[in-house]
């Protein structure tokens, strides 16, 4: 793809794009299995794009095998982030709950709120970092499996090779997440 706009146009070149996207959207509603199949479908779509094909892959459950590897990689990243945030969040909750009885210690309350704010900041920045690294993680996992996807040093090296492309892809993913969240909140036509 020479231009970013091609990324948005390519799926629409398939005459059956609407039915495929709707069916995959319905599959994605299934907890865990839908996400695994959706990740596999995305990897097959990337393969077709690289091969120069103009059609999206068929929408079905044939992609669970490819998707499970990528799902495991992202699960490890997000669980690691959750553990780091919990390491800060749990002491904050304990400190603040102790101060809820009677007269509180101002220093412990300050420490509790500081840890709480730090836990939120770590979680937010971590999620943004994972979103920005998603294209690199996907490509590394697709090429080398779980070990390559979890090789944080390799992922960061690849992200720094083309920082502009990584930044653009990350911003596109954030925009896609934002647009995806608008769907459930859009008012229904009557």
Question: In which residue ranges do the predicted regions lie?
Answer:
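Membrane-interface segments at the starts/ends of alpha-helical transmembrane spans
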Residues: 14, 18, 64, 104-120
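Phosphate-binding glycine-rich loops and adjacent basic patches that engage nucleotide phosphates
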Residues: 1-10, 100-102, 113-121, 167
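Membrane-interface extramembranous regions at the lipid-water interface
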Residues: 1-26, 37-76, 138-172
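Selective recognition of hydrophobic, aromatic-rich stretches within alpha-helical transmembrane segments
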Residues: 28-50, 82, 108-149, 170, ...
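Membrane-embedded alpha-helical bundles that form the substrate/pore pathway
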Residues: 66, 73-74, 78, 120, ...
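Ordered, amphipathic secondary-structure segments that act as subunit-interaction surfaces
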Residues: 75-87, 91
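Hydrophobic alpha-helical transmembrane segments and immediately flanking/interface helices
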Residues: 88-107, 182-190
């Amino acid at each position: 793809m020479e231009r970013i706009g091609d990324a948005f146009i390519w799926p629409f070149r398939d005459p059956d794009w609407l039915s495929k996207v709707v069916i995959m959207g319905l599959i994605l509603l299934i907890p865990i299995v839908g996400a695994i199949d959706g990740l596999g479908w995305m990897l097959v779509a990337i393969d077709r794009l690289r091969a120069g094909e103009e059609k999206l892959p068929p929408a079905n459950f044939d992609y669970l095998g490819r998707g499970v590897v990528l799902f495991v990689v992202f699960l490890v990243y997000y669980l690691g982030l959750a553990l780091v945030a919990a390491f800060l969040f749990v002491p904050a909750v304990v400190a603040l709950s102790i101060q809820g009885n009677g007269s509180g210690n101002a220093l412990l309350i300050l420490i509790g709120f500081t840890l709480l704010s730090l836990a939120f900041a770590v979680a937010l920045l971590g999620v943004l970092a994972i979103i920005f690294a998603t294209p690199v993680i996907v490509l590394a996992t697709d090429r080398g499996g779980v070990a390559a996807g979890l090789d944080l040093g390799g992922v960061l090296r690849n992200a720094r090779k083309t920082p502009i492309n990584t930044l653009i892809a990350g911003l596109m993913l954030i925009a896609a997440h934002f647009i995806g969240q608008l769907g459930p909140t859009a008012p229904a036509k009557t």
